[in-house]
């Protein structure tokens, strides 16, 4: 019994030794504000927070958090930094972009944004996080994201159903020349709307090139009027471009609505982030131009066939 008690104490001590170093689990809990569990076989300490503040139903059935509505962050000893983390935050639509900004500002990476269910009420999204750095910084980043999420719900207990920027005009009258002049593109008008497409290329396992017309592209579509417009679109980014482009778009107030992949086995690996913005055509276009400039400044990998 004495030996068992000693082993339990060692396994659950504030600083847990692993084959790769040590994790101060007490500091993780205090830094994130969450309680966690230690998985000795993997050298991972995981903190969790069930989303039980707002009831969620899927296909008419009330979902308990155990069935996939729990935010979490897992910490392990890093390779080149003190710790590495991964995580998944359960968010409602009006929480996504404020929380994303908080995570990015705190030094975390946002690696995916998508849904896990159909017919969920209210709609739930999942934001995947990653990062390497000091334990203090990574834990503080997780806490900052969760504090921001709670602030959104404190201000409005029930999840919002619109972005809140009002409605764009029913009749479209976008001056496409404004967009082309800023982006250096030649876009396509359509019934007062305007769309630009910027192609990229990836190589597939067959040795074939997948190109702009096959879906490897960045695009932006504008509707409304020059003073009151909506822009939606998609940025095609290689992995190293994702975080800089996200930071640029969020810094300009553009909403990110999805981050995922469209293909498998392509080279270089291409990710797609979908966005939605409101405002005047000129400031919206300048926001996109800033993100494109940030993207172009990222050095390409040696095997990059992409052309922005």
Report each predicted region and the residues it spans:
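Bacterial N-terminal signal peptides
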Residues: 2-15
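Long, contiguous binding/interaction regions
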Residues: 20-123, 130-270, 276-308
């Amino acid at each position: 019994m004495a030996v068992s008690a000693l082993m339990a104490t060692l396994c659950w001590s504030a600083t847990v030794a692993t084959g790769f170093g040590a994790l101060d689990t007490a500091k993780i809990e205090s830094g994130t504000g969450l309680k966690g569990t230690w998985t000795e076989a993997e050298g991972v300490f995981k903190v969790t927070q069930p989303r039980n503040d707002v009831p969620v139903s899927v296909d008419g059935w009330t979902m308990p958090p155990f069935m996939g509505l729990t935010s979490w962050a897992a910490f392990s000893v890093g390779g080149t930094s003190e710790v590495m983390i991964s995580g998944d935050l359960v968010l409602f639509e009006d929480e996504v972009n404020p929380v994303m900004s908080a995570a990015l500002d705190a030094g975390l990476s946002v690696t995916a944004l998508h849904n896990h269910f159909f017919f969920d009420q209210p709609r739930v999204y999942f934001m995947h996080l990653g990062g390497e750095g000091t334990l203090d910084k990574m834990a503080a980043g997780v806490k900052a994201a969760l504090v921001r999420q709670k602030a959104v719900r404190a201000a409005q207990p029930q999840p919002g159903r619109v972005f809140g920027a009002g409605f764009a005009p029913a009749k479209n009258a976008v001056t496409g020349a404004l967009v082309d002049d800023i982006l250096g593109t030649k876009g396509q008008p359509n019934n007062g709307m305007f769309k630009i497409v910027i192609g990229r290329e990836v190589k597939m396992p067959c040795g074939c090139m997948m190109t702009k017309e096959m879906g490897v592209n960045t695009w932006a579509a504008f509707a409304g009027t020059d003073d009151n417009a909506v822009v939606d679109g998609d940025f095609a980014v290689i992995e190293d471009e994702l975080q800089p482009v996200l930071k640029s778009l969020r810094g300009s107030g553009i909403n990110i609505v999805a981050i995922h992949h469209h293909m498998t086995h392509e080279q270089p690996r291409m990710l797609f982030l979908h966005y939605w913005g409101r405002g005047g055509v000129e400031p919206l276009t300048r926001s996109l131009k800033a993100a494109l400039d940030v993207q172009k400044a990222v050095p390409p990998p040696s095997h990059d066939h992409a052309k922005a």
